[in-house]
Amino acid sequence: MIKYVLISALLVVAVYSFTIEDNEDALLEEAEDELDTEEERRMALPPGAVCNGHKSDCQCFGAKYECSCPFLWRFRRSAKCHCKKGWAWTAVKKRSCHNRYQWSG
């Protein structure tokens, strides 16, 4: 009976330690995301500039501009994404951008 109690206690401690480790990783990821949004707030790329395809369209200046990437750009090293004029739906999506004050009147 005591063996079962000890084994159960060890399992609880092990699970708890993994949970704490996951929470620390999540906190680090949240901190990095906050830094990314601060960078987006500070600067917006002009039309035609090279942008990061992994980030949101908020990095491009203007309500209708989006980060447009070529077909299969992730598999080609030389392929780069650029800020290009998008559709009207792009302006609707970009209403939630943190740096929209830069291009909105």
Curated annotation (Swiss-Prot):
Disulfide bonds: C51-C67, C58-C97, C60-C83, C69-C81
Membrane spanning residue stretches: none
Tissue distribution: Expressed by the venom gland.
GO molecular function: potassium channel regulator activity; toxin activity
Chief localisation class: secreted
Record keywords: Disulfide bond, Ion channel impairing toxin, Neurotoxin, Potassium channel impairing toxin, Secreted, Signal, Toxin, Voltage-gated potassium channel impairing toxin
Residues of the propeptide: 18-41
Tagged with keyword Transport: no
Residues making up the signal peptide according to the UniProt record: 1-17
GO cellular component terms listed in the entry, alphabetical order: extracellular region
InterPro entries: Toxin_34 (IPR013605)
Pfam family, one: Toxin_34
Subcellular location: Secreted
Function: Insecticidal to house crickets. It induces an excitatory slow-onset impact that leads to irreversible spastic paralysis. It also modifies human voltage-gated potassium channel Kv1.5/KCNA5. Most likely, it binds to the voltage-sensing domain of the channel, suggesting it does not block the pore but prevents its opening at physiological membrane potentials. The recombinant peptide binds to the channel in an irreversible manner and slows down the hKv1.5 current activation kinetics. It is not toxic to mice, when intracranially injected (at 0.5 ug/g mouse).
Family that this chain belongs to: Belongs to the neurotoxin 04 (omega-agtx) family. 01 (type I omega-agtx) subfamily.
Protein known as: U2-lycotoxin-Ls1d
Organism placement in taxonomy: Eukaryota, Metazoa, Ecdysozoa, Arthropoda, Chelicerata
